[in-house]
Amino acid sequence: MEMDLSKVTLDIFTKLEQKWLSHCDSSRKTRILSIDGGGTTGIVAAASILHLEHQIRLQTGDPHAHISDFFDIVAGTGIGGILAALLVADDGSGRPMFTARDAVKFVAEKNSELFEIRYTGVFRRNKRYSGKSMERVLETAFRREDGKVLTMKDTCKPLLVPCYDLKTSAPFVFSRAGASESPSFDFELWKVCRATSATPSLFKPFSVVSVDGKTSCSAVDGGLVMNNPTAAAVTHVLHNKRDFPSVNGVDDLLVLSLGNGPSTMSSSPGRKLRRNGDYSTSSVVDIVVDGVSDTVDQMLGNAFCWNRTDYVRIQANGLTSGGAEELLKERGVETAPFGVKRILTESNGERIEGFVQRLVASGKSSLPPSPCKESAVNPLADGR
């Protein structure tokens, strides 16, 4: 009897899986949007997602189109993680709660509360940010009108947000895939954003616990290990056959990676040194964060060297120092094989416009729900 029940269960799951796979278009590339951490304003990413959404609406003729309609997964670190979560937070009907403009407006208007400065030390010279103020703002943002506090499962598209766990001395990646597998890997969205933003020199580590209380981590800024989360997103898609069954390699991917510019400190090399010639803690963090982003960009530049149009990286080239409009007018920077960087003839704005043409041509994202949401049969746990 036990063998018959197991066989029936397997047959049910197999049929559900076949039905699910039949809806997947194997010819369409899987679209990834990745947003870097770095800084407190996210000016490069903010300018980029505003232009991205504007172009999507312009080229589709749909004034209500959202960025999440044309991407299959969104990843973000630090301030980029907050923007990513805002873009995919589900309003309860399967639609995003925030447009790109809403998300950027939220970060801009709430910036002084998200990063409320307070001074510590005997002479009040040490600058830190108030974790309580950020937590209050984030918890309000990720709460629906009916009072429901959103978790990683409450996103209209897969979401990936990294942090660094001091308890295990290893990266910890929050994902919707993990949240769908088990409540032990499901976390409240506001806590995820708080965790990935806990820069060591400015915030205290943040203790985050899963919704069932079984998994916890002592989180600091994900930028220490994954400031540019693009590689993590690519790896996640390549190994997550449940949600992305048609992806066999980078040839099946279309990636837009949004940088956040060099940190304020790193933009002026001489300011990294104290008067005695030592580096400050915040300067070391800046160096690590910028280095991580550049290293990931070089790796992906090599991986996509035969199909460069499938990987677009938007980053400030450092030749101008202006606002959002100036950043979009800057000539783009591309990483060639072996770490060589070259200035392109296209501006960052033009590169986004060209990328949107490919997005629109491929149509709206139509990833079906995970099989585990259609069946009481739990798939084998294969990690996050």
UniProtKB/Swiss-Prot annotation:
Residues 33-234 form the PNPLA domain. The active site is at residue 221. One of its GO terms (molecular function) is hydrolase activity. InterPro entries: Acyl_Trfase/lysoPLipase, PNPLA_dom. A motif (DGA/G) lies at residues 221-223. Transmembrane segments: none annotated. A motif (GXGXXG) lies at residues 37-42. Keywords: Hydrolase, Lipid degradation, Lipid metabolism. Highly expressed in roots and at lower levels in flowers and siliques. GO terms for biological process: lipid catabolic process. This is Probable inactive patatin-like protein 9. It comes from Arabidopsis thaliana (Mouse-ear cress).
